[in-house]
Amino acid sequence: MFQGSIVAIVTPFKNGAVDEEKLRELVEFQIENGTDAIVPCGTTGESSTLSYVEHDRVIQVVVEQVNKRVPVIAGTGSNSTHEAIEITQHAKELGADGALLVTPYYNKPSQEGLFRHYKAVADAVALPQILYNVPGRTGVNLLPETVARLSVHQNIVAIKEATGSLQQASEVLALCGDKIDVLSGDDFITLPIMAAGGKGVISVTANIMPKEVSSLVDAFNAGNLEEARRLHLYLLKISNAMFIESNPVPVKAAVSLMGKCSSEVRLPLAPLMEANLAKLTAIMKEYKLI
């Protein structure tokens, strides 16, 4: 259902507030350059530091600006199941086409707890939902066997696999078959995951190079493996640079260097350190992005 090059879009700020004008411009930049779907309020969108009102407003602005040209998949995860249900329902009411739900963080649920959490949200809200597994941030790993149990639910349509492990992604693919789609959650392994049967990527790099990320996915789907491999290797350095510090600090700096919005992030995130900003600037010049 949700396939291809999907951007986890940044949330631009200006003087501490959401910069709606720049957000709309970023949406246009994505659509003009071939992005297949947009995820507002994900990790890259700094969802954890948005108020409930801001969270709803960011989704609303993106839905309005997209105007049904591509799917909008709202980040609606929480470490409270009740809250995740409420946020997902709000996203549906605002016109989102789907929801991306990160595994509950900090409280470290068991696999049974994770299963019950996701099932409860999927039972409560009739909206296509993507599981989001990123144990490096959440402290819990949604194991392939649990994904397989969830894959039979009609409202669970995909998983964003951000373990960085090709083995785990492959195990999910082997256990789930075509019941759900597997999307790479790490730009640097998009091509290997697609080669194993994945359907695309939820990308950080697409914030600055949407055309190239989209072209990689399209080349693979067209059977042009040589071009897909070329783009995979070409994007590797810039994709790694997006994690020179904690996401989304580097990508916010990169988008700012391109003149598209402020690099402002919210505490407890801090601006990119000067030494890393110099490294990022040099890499972006190599790619002729600035």
UniProtKB/Swiss-Prot annotation:
- Note the superkingdom of the native organism: Bacteria
Keywords, sorted A to Z = Amino-acid biosynthesis, Cytoplasm, Diaminopimelate biosynthesis, Lyase, Lysine biosynthesis, Schiff base
**S-S pairs:** none
CDD domains, per database record: DHDPS
Record carries keyword Manganese: no
Question: Which EC class, in a word?
Answer: lyase
An example of a Pfam family matching this protein is DHDPS
EC number in record: 4.3.3.7
Q: Which InterPro entries match?
A: Aldolase_TIM, DapA, DapA-like, Schiff_base-form_aldolases_AS, Schiff_base-form_aldolases_CS
Q: Which GO terms describe its molecular function?
A: 4-hydroxy-tetrahydrodipicolinate synthase activity
Q: Which SUPFAM superfamilies match?
A: Aldolase (SSF51569)
- Reaction(s) the record says it catalyses: L-aspartate 4-semialdehyde + pyruvate = (2S,4S)-4-hydroxy-2,3,4,5-tetrahydrodipicolinate + H2O + H(+)
* One GO CC term, this protein: cytosol
* Pathway annotation: Amino-acid biosynthesis; L-lysine biosynthesis via DAP pathway; (S)-tetrahydrodipicolinate from L-aspartate: step 3/4
Biological process, per Gene Ontology: diaminopimelate biosynthetic process; lysine biosynthetic process via diaminopimelate
Main localisation, per the record? cytoplasm
Point out the coiled-coil segments of this chain: none
Q: Subunit structure, per the record?
A: Homotetramer; dimer of dimers.
The family note in this entry says: Belongs to the DapA family.
State the name under which the record lists this protein. Answer: 4-hydroxy-tetrahydrodipicolinate synthase
The organism is Geobacter sp. (strain M21)
